[in-house]
C-alpha cells in the first residue's frame, strides 16, 4: 500500500490510500486475476474520481474500478500460500459436504454456483469445484454444470499459479490429482 499525496488538489481526499500499485496483480470477482495497468483520474457525470485500470489476464477485457469502490466491488489481493493450503483442504474434504446439491433442480444449482463464482471469494469457488466434482461422480453433468466447473477450475488455477509462481499446467495437475484422490 502507498498513499497518494497532493496530485489532485481541490478534491479534498488527496490522502486516500491506494491498495494496488501499477504493475501488480489483483483479483476481480468473476474475471479472476487482473493486472493494474494504470491509475487515472476520470470525470464521469460531472464527478472526478481516481480509477484503477485493470486488464484481465489472458483476455482482451479492461475494467475501470473507482479506487474508493474497490473494496465494495470485491477487488482483492491475490491469495497467500497459506490460503492455498486451505483451498486444497476444501477440495480434499468430502466428509463435510452438505449434500452436493444433487437433489436440487439444475437451474437452482446453476444460479447458486454462478453467484458463488461472482462473489470473488476464492474459498466459495473451491467449494463449487468440489461440489460439482462430487456431483459428477453421482450423475452426468449438464452442459451448464460443466461450464461452471470449468470456470471454477480456471479461476482457481490462474490465481494459485500466480500465488505459487508456477505454470498453470502444474497447478491444473495438482488440482486434478486432489480431486481424483478425493473421490
Question: What are the functions of these language-model segments?
Answer:
Residues 5, 23, 31, 48, ...:
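Generic signature of intrinsically disordered, low-complexity segments enriched in small/polar residues
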Residues 13-75:
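A positional/architectural concept
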Residues 7-8, 18, 139:
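Generic secretory/membrane-interface signal
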Residues 1-12, 172:
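Protein maturation boundaries and topogenic segments
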Residues 68-183:
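Charge/polar-rich, low-complexity and marginally structured segments
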Amino acid at each position: 500500500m502507498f498513499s497518494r499525496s497532493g496530485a489532485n488538489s481541490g478534491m479534498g481526499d488527496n490522502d486516500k490510500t491506494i491498495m494496488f500499485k501499477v504493475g501488480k496483480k489483483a483479483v476481480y470477482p468473476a474475471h479472476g486475476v487482473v493486472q493494474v495497468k494504470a491509475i487515472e483520474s476520470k470525470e464521469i457525470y460531472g464527478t472526478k474520481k481516481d480509477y484503477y485500470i485493470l486488464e484481465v489476464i489472458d483476455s482482451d477485457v479492461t475494467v475501470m474500478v473507482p479506487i474508493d469502490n474497490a473494496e465494495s466491488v470485491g477487488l482483492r489481493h491475490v491469495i497467500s500460500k497459506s490460503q492455498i493450503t486451505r483451498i486444497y483442504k476444501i477440495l480434499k474434504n468430502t466428509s463435510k459436504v452438505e449434500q452436493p446439491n444433487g437433489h436440487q433442480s439444475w437451474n437452482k444449482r446453476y444460479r447458486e454456483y454462478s453467484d458463488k463464482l461472482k462473489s470473488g471469494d476464492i474459498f466459495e469457488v473451491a467449494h463449487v469445484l468440489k461440489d460439482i466434482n462430487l456431483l459428477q461422480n453421482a450423475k452426468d453433468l449438464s452442459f451448464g454444470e460443466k461450464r461452471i466447473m470449468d470456470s471454477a477450475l480456471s479461476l482457481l488455477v490462474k490465481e494459485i499459479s500466480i500465488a505459487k509462481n508456477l505454470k498453470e499446467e502444474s497447478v491444473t495437475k495438482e488440482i486434478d490429482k486432489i480431486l481424483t484422490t478425493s473421490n
